Each structure stands twice: as structure tokens, then as C-alpha cells.
């Protein structure tokens, strides 16, 4: 009996751990089916295994009750949407109410009295259970703004608290799982301050979808990117800024879901020759063939646009843009999606939100890179990686720019960046526009240099930026992006073998199962998962002492060298150096900086996390970490130049905006493309 209880306890612990996995929240719009030709998308076209949560946008409201937008939604789209759960039992579906075009007046009326809110809540539970939704998403843009009175900020909180109470009560009475409750919120600071009590929302909601896009658009007089990952000093708007702002105000990181758009914002340039970031613009570019909205292109339309356009990469913001004549579009692609996904993982946010699933290349017919080329990247990094037995990739795309943490042990770099501390957002976010100086939370190297683990520099062909503390890239290397295209930030190519392969310097690291490494001129082949054995299964004999790493353990018995099965053995009183600490034969400790240590017997190569003194009659466990590792908290330089998927390419290494539109015009929507319905 006690064994059964122990087993149940272990299962519960594992389930709790699974619950900490990243969410991938994807919106699907009820007008996607009305687009012409191959752009028409229905729920059965969606992949039920791609996202962890699917949200149907939008429901409407009538007489303080939630209702389907039209009869077709209720009779066809709702059933087809929720039928996806028959193929994936883990999938959760939610119904969203609101949107930009919904306005605020009906929300205000419903929120105004307890009786109205009670009526709304009863209708919500009834509609969700009738159509087999798992929860409700509130898309109120925005309490206290756009005609909504200031007290809506507080009545909105009352509604959320009352919804949660009713959901819990209904779950107890029906013995069904509690309905989920989420909300879509602005990422613009002045809207956040006006519309939300961040701590209260963070405490009550199951997750919070931060709309960290529509940060720039054709309502402005200068070009700017729709959803840059990081900020520039003259323009703090960015996805990282928005996420760190919510966290700084008290929202739990694990509940914050970063919004990532599958569309771009377009501009019409004043002059075709002035086509960079912050170039003068005179309005929106032409509407897309399928979305038919000025200043806006879905990703599947952007694929056609960029074939004949000049493509550029915005350094420090990690997003692309393209221009063709006087038309300019700032958009996201598979590379920028991967950067954003790794940022989410590095900063321990709850996951990613996609607006929208139906604006990706759903069938793979427009872009030629397979179905859902953008969202698949997020799934690969945020969802499948959580349950994979493979080790994490050898690169962490996590610049300290816009980061909320500072690494005090970061390697010193002689040339750094200078910024005005007054523009730093919550969490120590910083940006850069020129080439030399110093910033607290950022390690930057000038052109032609990169930082190595031994604090030496090596030549690099292009401008480099040192990434965060978990970056494990050296030199100008190439990565393969999540099973898709091979991206080449430097001038060397990476081809995935199994999972990843990397080139550092002149040596090749080829993935065999999990990892294999070539330090010096030796080839190490993994045995099991992370242990390493030198070439031809021969032991390493530095200084006359033989060590044969076979698995995770070493053992010394009396005065003899023994090599038992699945164990490695070293002679007595042998000092094994480590990444951080070595124990000398006299029992003293001393730090290591990459060099070998000499004991009474000989000199040994670096192994694992701890240097151990092997004495007679002692049995000691070595770390199960990979034998060859870089020191922790070591930031390495990363070459930011990418070779794009399509055609020609240039990189914006240094941007000096002419103007800094720090806030949107009041008459222009902050998220005007949140829905494209009439």
C-alpha cells in the first residue's frame, strides 16, 4: 500500500512539474474563413498539437450577456474548433470576448452594476459549457480609455474576482475542471498605468497575454518596427520592455505571456532612397491581396512581398524589415521568432502568445517552408523542448540588453557602451545605437573581437554583441534554427546532425545522439548521455596518470587502478581539475581558470563540476554534467549578421533615429490591428 502511495506522490510531483512548462497561446479569428481563395482558413485546417491553448476570437455581447458573434460561429465554427481536442486531449480552448472594434461602451454598461455583472457571468458559464470551451479570455481595450470611464479600471477588477469565484463554485458543484480565466492587456506603459491594477490581475488570472506588438505603425510619420524584441535609447518601446514593465509592477513572471505577431506593419516612404529605420513616411503602404487592410500585411502576404524586396536586419532589436521602392514593412520571420522564444525561456516568462494562428502560412503554400513556419519555431523551443530528453542547445540567444538580471561575474570587456540611465526601463533594460561605451547589464565588444572563456580575444569578421550569462557560443559560428533553415550569423555553416552541430574556431563539434566535442585534436564520443570517452576508447594519460571516463562515477580501491563496468577509476591522490574548484592532495581548495592542476601523480584534464582528490579506501561520485563545459556565467560574443532565407540582405549595425515617437497619438489605436474585422 505504501508503495502505491509513494508512486501516486511521484506522479503528482511530475504532473506539477509539467504544469510549469511554457504555454503557447494561439488566437484564431472568426473572420479567417472569409478571406479569399487559399487564404481562407477554417478550424479543421489547424494543427491541434501546435499550441497548448487555442483562443477563439471573438464572441460578442448583447443585453449584458455573452453571445456568439453570428449563427455560423455557434453552429459551425465553435463545434469544429473544439473538435480539435478529440485529436489532442491536452489541448485547452478558450473563448475571447472584446477586441478593438468591439469598443468599450458595452463593457462599461455590463460592469456598472453587480446585477449586470452577475447576469454576464451566468451567461459566460452557460455558453462555455454548452460548446465545450475550457475558459474565457477578456479582451477589453482598454478600461479607463477610449471612452471608458476611469472607474472601469476598478469594476473590471470586480468582474474578474466575481468570475473566478463563480468558476470555482461551478467546478465544485459539477465536479468538472474549473474554467480558465485570462486577459489580453496592453504593453504600453501609459496604458498599463491607467487601465490595470497589475498585482491584482497577476494574483487572480490564470495567465496574462501582453500585447507587445503594434508598437509602431503607419499612424506615425517615421518608420518603426511593429514588434522589436529590444529597445533603442531614443525609443524604449519593445517586447522586452513591455514584459519587464509588467513584471516590475508585480505580475508573476510565470503568468506573463509575450505577444508575438504573425503580421507586419507597412509604411509608404517619402523618398525611396531614404528607407532605413526612422525614415520619413507619408502613410500606409498598399493593402495586402488577402487581408485588404492598408498599413498591414499577414505573414503569408509578406512572403510574396519580400521576394523582390531588399531585406535588412535591425541590430540590437533582432527583427527584420524589407523595402521595395517606396513601400516598407517591419515584420517577424523564423529567425526573430527564435530569438523571442529564447528570450522567453531565459527570462522565465510563462510562454508566448501568437496573434494570429491563421495569419501564419497555415498550409505552407505561400512561403514554401512548410505549414506554420513561424509558430512551429515557438512550438519547437517552448513546448517540445520542455518534454525532450535531449540537452538544451549550445546557444542562448539572450542578450543582456533589456534583461531584468545582471551577472556580477560577467567577463570584463575593455570597450563597452554608454547610455543615458534615464531611459532604462524596469528591470534594467538598455539599448544601443553606436559603437563604443559601457552599459551595466550588457557586455559588448567592438568590431573584430570576441570574448573567449579565457578572457582572450579572437578576430571576428563582423560586429559582435556578447549575449547573456548562459550564452555558450564562441567565435563566428552558425546555428541551425529548430529543424528549419540553417542560419549563418558568422561565415561558417552549421548542419544539424541529430540535434545541433556547431563550429568554434577551426574545430568542428558534431552532434552524435546528444553531444560530441573536439577539444584540441582529440575526438570525444559520448557514452550514454553525457559521459565522454577519448578517441579509440583510450584513456587520457597526462603526466603519466591514466583516467578512463566511462560513465558517471570514479572509484579508487586501495592502491590499485581498477576499471569496473560503467565506472571510471583514477589512482589515489590524483587532483582532477574542474570548472570552478579543485581540491588539492593536502585538502586545500583553489580556483581554476582553465589550466590543469598537477597533483602528486600527474596532471589531469578538466572533468565535470568538481575536482576530486582520490585517496585509498574512498569512493567518490563525479558530476553527471558533460565533461567538457564552459565555466558558468560566461558570456561569449555572438555575431549578429544573418544570411536571410530570401535573396539579398543587409544589416543595420548602427541606427540613429531622427525622431523618437514615444507614445501613440490619442486618435490612433495602440493595437489597431488586433482584429481586422469590419
UniProtKB/Swiss-Prot annotation:
Tissue expression pattern: Oviduct.
The secretion signal range is 1-21
Where in the chain are disulfide-linked cysteines found? Answer: 26-51
The alphabetized UniProt keywords are: Cytoplasmic vesicle, Disulfide bond, Fertilization, Glycoprotein, Signal
Pfam families linked: Glyco_hydro_18 (PF00704)
Annotated GO CC locations: cytosol; egg coat; extracellular region; intracellular membrane-bounded organelle; microtubule cytoskeleton; perivitelline space; transport vesicle
Instruction: Give residues annotated as binding chitin.
Output: 71-72, 98-101, 142, 211-214, 355
Gene Ontology biological process: carbohydrate metabolic process; chitin catabolic process; female pregnancy; negative regulation of binding of sperm to zona pellucida; single fertilization
Coiled coil residues, start to end: none
Q: Which residues form the GH18 domain?
A: 22-385
Q: Where is the composition biased (Polar residues)?
A: 528-544, 651-662
Decide whether keyword Hydrolase is in the record.
no
Where is carbohydrate linked to this protein? 402, 441, 580, 596, 648
**Briefly, what is this protein's role?**
Binds to oocyte zona pellucida in vivo. May play a role in the fertilization process and/or early embryonic development.
By sequence similarity, the record places it as follows: Belongs to the glycosyl hydrolase 18 family.
For this entry, the protein name equals Oviduct-specific glycoprotein
Q: Which organism was this protein described from? A: Homo sapiens (Human)
Gene symbol? OVGP1
Amino acid at each position: 500500500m505504501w508503495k502505491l502511495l509513494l508512486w501516486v506522490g511521484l506522479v503528482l510531483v511530475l504532473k506539477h512539474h509539467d504544469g510549469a512548462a511554457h504555454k503557447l497561446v494561439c488566437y484564431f479569428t472568426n473572420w479567417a474563413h472569409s478571406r479569399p481563395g487559399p487564404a481562407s482558413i477554417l478550424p479543421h485546417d489547424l494543427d491541434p498539437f501546435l499550441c497548448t491553448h487555442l483562443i477563439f476570437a471573438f464572441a460578442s455581447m448583447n443585453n449584458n450577456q455573452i453571445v456568439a458573434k453570428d449563427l455560423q460561429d455557434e453552429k459551425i465554427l465553435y463545434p469544429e474548433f473544439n473538435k480539435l481536442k478529440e485529436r489532442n486531449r491536452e489541448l485547452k480552448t478558450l473563448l475571447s470576448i472584446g477586441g478593438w472594434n468591439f469598443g468599450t461602451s458595452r463593457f462599461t454598461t455590463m460592469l456598472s452594476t453587480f446585477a449586470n455583472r452577475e447576469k454576464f457571468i451566468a451567461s459566460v458559464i452557460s455558453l462555455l459549457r454548452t460548446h465545450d470551451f475550457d475558459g474565457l479570455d477578456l479582451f477589453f481595450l482598454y478600461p479607463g480609455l477610449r471612452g471608458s470611464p476611469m472607474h472601469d479600471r476598478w469594476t473590471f477588477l470586480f468582474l474578474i474576482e466575481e468570475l473566478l469565484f463563480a468558476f470555482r463554485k461551478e467546478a465544485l458543484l459539477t465536479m468538472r475542471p474549473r474554467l480558465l480565466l485570462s486577459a489580453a492587456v496592453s504593453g504600453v506603459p501609459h496604458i498599463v498605468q491607467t487601465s490595470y491594477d497589475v498585482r491584482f490581475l497577476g494574483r487572480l488570472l490564470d495567465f496574462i497575454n501582453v500585447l507587445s506588438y503594434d508598437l509602431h505603425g503607419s499612424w506615425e510619420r517615421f518608420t518603426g518596427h511593429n514588434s522589436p524584441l529590444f529597445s533603442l535609447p531614443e525609443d524604449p518601446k519593445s517586447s522586452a520592455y513591455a514584459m519587464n514593465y509588467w513584471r516590475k509592477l508585480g505580475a508573476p513572471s510565470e503568468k506573463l505571456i509575450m505577444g508575438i505577431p504573425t503580421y507586419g506593419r507597412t509604411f509608404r516612404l517619402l523618398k525611396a532612397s531614404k528607407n532605413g529605420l526612422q525614415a520619413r513616411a507619408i502613410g500606409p503602404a498598399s493593402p495586402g491581396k488577402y487581408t485588404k487592410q492598408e498599413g498591414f500585411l499577414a505573414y503569408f502576404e509578406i512572403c510574396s512581398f519580400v521576394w523582390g524586396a531588399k531585406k535588412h536586419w535591425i541590430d540590437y532589436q533582432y527583427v527584420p524589415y524589407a523595402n521595395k521602392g517606396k513601400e516598407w514593412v517591419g515584420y517577424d520571420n523564423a529567425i526573430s521568432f527564435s530569438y523571442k522564444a529564447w528570450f522567453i525561456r531565459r527570462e522565465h516568462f510563462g510562454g508566448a502568445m501568437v496573434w494570429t494562428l491563421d495569419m501564419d502560412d497555415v498550409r505552407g503554400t505561400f512561403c514554401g517552408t512548410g505549414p506554420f513556419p513561424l509558430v512551429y519555431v515557438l512550438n519547437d523551443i517552448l513546448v517540445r523542448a520542455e518534454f525532450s530528453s535531449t540537452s538544451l542547445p549550445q546557444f542562448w540567444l539572450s542578450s543582456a540588453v533589456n534583461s531584468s538580471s545582471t551577472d556580477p561575474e560577467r567577463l570584463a570587456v575593455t570597450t563597452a557602451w554608454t547610455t543615458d540611465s534615464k531611459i532604462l526601463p524596469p528591470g534594467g533594460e538598455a539599448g544601443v545605437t553606436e559603437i563604443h561605451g559601457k552599459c551595466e547589464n550588457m557586455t559588448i565588444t567592438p568590431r573584430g573581437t570576441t570574448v573567449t572563456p579565457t578572457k582572450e580575444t579572437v578576430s571576428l569578421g563582423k560586429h559582435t554583441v556578447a549575449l547573456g550569462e548562459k550564452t555558450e557560443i564562441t567565435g563566428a559560428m552558425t546555428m541551425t534554427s529548430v529543424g528549419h533553415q540553417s542560419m549563418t550569423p558568422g561565415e561558417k555553416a552549421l548542419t544539424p546532425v541529430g540535434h545541433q552541430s556547431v563550429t568554434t574556431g577551426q574545430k568542428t563539434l558534431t552532434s552524435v545522439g546528444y553531444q560530441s566535442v573536439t577539444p584540441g585534436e582529440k575526438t570525444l564520443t559520448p557514452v550514454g548521455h553525457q559521459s565522454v570517452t577519448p578517441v579509440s576508447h583510450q584513456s587520457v594519460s597526462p603526466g603519466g596518470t591514466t583516467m578512463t571516463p566511462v560513465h558517471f562515477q570514479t572509484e579508487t580501491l586501495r592502491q590499485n587502478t581498477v576499471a569496473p563496468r560503467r565506472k571510471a577509476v583514477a589512482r589515489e591522490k590524483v587532483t582532477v581539475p574542474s570548472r570552478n574548484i579543485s581540491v588539492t592532495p593536502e585538502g586545500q581548495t583553489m580556483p581554476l581558470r582553465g589550466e590543469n592542476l598537477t597533483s602528486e601523480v600527474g596532471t589531469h584534464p578538466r572533468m565535470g563540476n568538481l575536482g576530486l582528490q582520490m585517496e585509498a579506501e574512498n569512493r567518490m561520485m563525479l558530476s553527471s554534467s558533460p565533461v567538457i563545459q564552459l565555466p558558468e556565467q560566461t558570456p561569449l560574443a555572438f555575431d549578429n549578421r544573418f544570411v536571410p532565407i530570401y535573396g539579398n540582405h543587409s544589416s543595420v549595425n548602427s541606427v540613429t533615429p531622427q525622431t523618437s515617437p514615444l507614445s501613440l497619438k490619442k486618435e490612433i489605436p495602440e493595437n489597431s490591428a488586433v482584429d481586422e474585422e469590419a
